[in-house]
Amino acid sequence: MGVVFAFGFYLIFIKLTGLKLMDYFPRFKENRLKMIFSILSVILAFLINWLIMKNFSFLIEIIHPIASVWIFIILIYLLLRFLFLKRVPLSNYEKKFMGNMSAIAIFLELLKIIEYVDEHNIASPITVALVFFIPVVVFFNCKYFYEMELSS
C-alpha cells in the first residue's frame, strides 16, 4: 500500500505539473529545483503514508498548517513577482505548479473543515467555511488580479 500511495503522490506532484523524472538526468544542473521538488514529493508521500498507518487523527492535525503555509507561500511569491517582475508573464510551469498547489491546499482545507464540523457538531457549517476559506479566496483574488495586470 505504501508503494501505491507514493506512486499516487508522484503522479500528483510530478506528472500534473508536466515534469518527467527521466528528463532531469541529462541536464541535471538546469533542473535542480525541479529535481528537489520531485524528491521531496516522494519523501512526503512516504511520510504521509506512515502517518496514516500510525495515527489518522495526527494526520488531520497537521493538514491545516500545511495548507495554510502553502497558501501563504503562494501569496508571497505572487506579491514578489508583482512588485519586481511586472512585465514578465508566468511560465507554463509556474501556472501549473500554482494551480496544483492551490487545488491541493483547498482539498486539505476541506478535510480540515469536515473534521472540525464532525468534532464540534456545529449547526452552521457556513460559519466554519467562511473562517477556513478566507485565505483561499484571498489567494484566488490575488492570482486573478495579477493575471489581469500582466495581460494589460
UniProtKB/Swiss-Prot annotation:
It is a multi-pass membrane protein. The lineage of its organism: Archaea, Methanobacteriati, Methanobacteriota, Methanomada group, Methanococci. The keyword Cell membrane applies. It is found in: Cell membrane. The chain crosses the membrane at residues 2-22, 33-53, 58-78, 97-117, 122-142. It comes from Methanocaldococcus jannaschii (strain ATCC 43067 / DSM 2661 / JAL-1 / JCM 10045 / NBRC 100440) (Methanococcus jannaschii). Keywords: Cell membrane, Membrane, Transmembrane, Transmembrane helix. One of its GO terms (cellular component) is plasma membrane. This is Uncharacterized protein MJ1358.
